[in-house]
Amino acid sequence: MVERLGEFAAVELKYATRPVDVKIDRFGEPLRTHCLIVKNQAASDLIMYNYWKDVRRIEALTQCYPAVKGGVALIVTNNVTYWREPRTDSGYRAFSTYDGNTRSPGLLQWDTDIAESVRRTHSDFELLGTYPCRWA
């Protein structure tokens, strides 16, 4: 939360990465050990789901608390999966964050080909607002 003059804004941040593996030199010599700079965070579909749950949480906060005026949800990533449009038969399409996508009010739910275990732990939910996805 960010507060200014008694008004609040919620801030939600996701940091989703793909591995970055580089050779590093120190003191004019390559490091002798393997150096993984950024680790791989798999399950991008679940991270996207959690992103939209963050948006829903901000909506709920603004509904419940008059002092909360809004918020922002961000994903910081080096993984193109988040800004590229998924295939039309993708099971997570409803939760996609691709560039140019606009999420309209309504129910967000998994496609029928998603595993039952995912459906049990990541239930459908509704968004109240309209949210454009823009990547820079």
What do these predicted regions represent?
Residues 1, 11, 72-76:
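Extended hydrophobic secondary-structure segments that form protein cores and membrane-embedded regions
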Residues 123-136:
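C-terminal edge-of-domain segments
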Residues 2, 7-23, 28-38, 58:
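Conserved catalytic cores of phosphodiester-cleaving nucleases, focusing on short active-site segments
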Residues 30-120:
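Acidic, metal/cofactor-coordinating or nucleic-acid-engaging core segments within structured domains
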